[in-house]
Amino acid sequence: CLLRWPGVVEPNSVSNEIVGSHDFLPTLVSAAGEPDVMEKLKSGYEANGKTYKVHIDGYDMTPYLTGETEEHSRPGFLYFSDDGDILAMRYHNWKIVFMEQETKGTLYLWMHPFLTLRTPKIFNLRTDPFEYADITPNTYYDSILRHEYLFVPAQKLVGDFLETFKEFPPRQKAASFSLSDVLDKLQSSGRSN
């Protein structure tokens, strides 16, 4: 992302930290003078005469951007499919892949399901930005065994995310183009004969 904030963000500075689009809401609202909006939204926040009680998976980047702290506030990033499945996660330099698309192509790959891996793949995105390590060297799987410790913070990050569903369950299921999913939805709504 590119950011210009005269007098706050140092010109020509570069950060390799992770920022998601949903981080813009808490960051911009905080910059406008309303800090902690994410916590306020969880307990019920009134704006423009309406009360919003919702959990948004965004992080306020203002303390990091202003130099108030050197610690980035986002612990990691989850990658989702358009069906709502957690495909992978990013944790610092590492990407941990739980499901992958084996089909190659454009729309053709979208027509085929993801493969759920029995053991996650691990990539160091600083040294392997194109994620080729699993297909090029003979020592890739030895490397996974040496980096098993990454599964602990991965489990915590995913667990913390899933924990939010207790108080804030998903509002809707992801749309599907699968015929069986569409038929199930029609049958559960009582619209089929």
List each model region and its residues.
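Catalytic cores of eukaryotic secretory-pathway lumenal/extracellular enzymes that build
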Residues: 2-3, 119
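A structural signal for alpha-helix termini and helix-coil/disorder junctions
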Residues: 5, 34, 67, 160-167
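C-terminal cap/loop subdomain of S1 sulfatases and analogous C-terminal strand-loop tails that border
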Residues: 8-13, 17, 22-132
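Long, internal low-complexity/basic segments
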Residues: 96-97, 102-103, 111-121, 125-193
